[in-house]
Amino acid sequence: MEKKHIYLFCSAGMSTSLLVSKMRAQAEKYEVPVIIEAFPETLAGEKGQNADVVLLGPQIAYMLPEIQRLLPNKPVEVIDSLLYGKVDGLGVLKAAVAAIKKAAAN
């Protein structure tokens, strides 16, 4: 299976770095073929074009409509604040994979 790209965006690109590390560890553990990267929200329009799913940190949830407009053919979702706060790599990975599958079914 081709690797899917999961891109996380937050206000500076730094607050998601620990979450990305945990997601990568879970993806490796469960052999989920994904590439997971984090970027600042200012790069969402540019970098998001290459993503299979775009995840926004809860602190930029207000930007959801704007980023959906920039990336009309991509699934764009806000990371659940409880999962984000707990730095739950597996939970966020599962949500991202579900969003990719949902988009593929449509």
Curated annotation (Swiss-Prot):
Keyword terms, alphabetized: Cytoplasm, Kinase, Phosphoprotein, Phosphotransferase system, Sugar transport, Transferase, Transport
GO biological process: N,N'-diacetylchitobiose import; phosphoenolpyruvate-dependent sugar phosphotransferase system
Described function: The phosphoenolpyruvate-dependent sugar phosphotransferase system (sugar PTS), a major carbohydrate active transport system, catalyzes the phosphorylation of incoming sugar substrates concomitantly with their translocation across the cell membrane. The enzyme II ChbABC PTS system is involved in the transport of the chitin disaccharide N,N'-diacetylchitobiose (GlcNAc2). Also able to use N,N',N''-triacetyl chitotriose (GlcNAc3).
Localization of this protein: Cytoplasm
Any one Gene Ontology molecular-function term assigned to this protein's record: protein-phosphocysteine-N,N'-diacetylchitobiose phosphotransferase system transporter activity
Active site: C10
Recorded name of the encoding gene: chbB
Major site of localization recorded for this protein: cytoplasm
Reaction(s) catalysed (UniProt annotation): N,N'-diacetylchitobiose(out) + N(pros)-phospho-L-histidyl-[protein] = diacetylchitobiose-6'-phosphate(in) + L-histidyl-[protein]
EC nos: 2.7.1.196
Example of a GO cellular component annotation carried by this entry: transmembrane transporter complex
Record-annotated PTS EIIB type-3 domain positions: 3-106
UniProt-listed SUPFAM superfamilies: PTS system IIB component-like (SSF52794)
Domain notes: The PTS EIIB type-3 domain is phosphorylated by phospho-EIIA on a cysteinyl residue. Then, it transfers the phosphoryl group to the sugar substrate concomitantly with the sugar uptake processed by the PTS EIIC type-3 domain.
Induction line: By GlcNAc2, GlcNAc3 and beta-N,N'-diacetylchitobiose (Me-TCB).
Effect of C10S: Unable to be phosphorylated by EIIA
Complex and partners: Forms a complex with ChbA (EIIA). ChbB is a monomer in both its unphosphorylated and phosphorylated forms.
Name the record gives this protein: PTS system N,N'-diacetylchitobiose-specific EIIB component
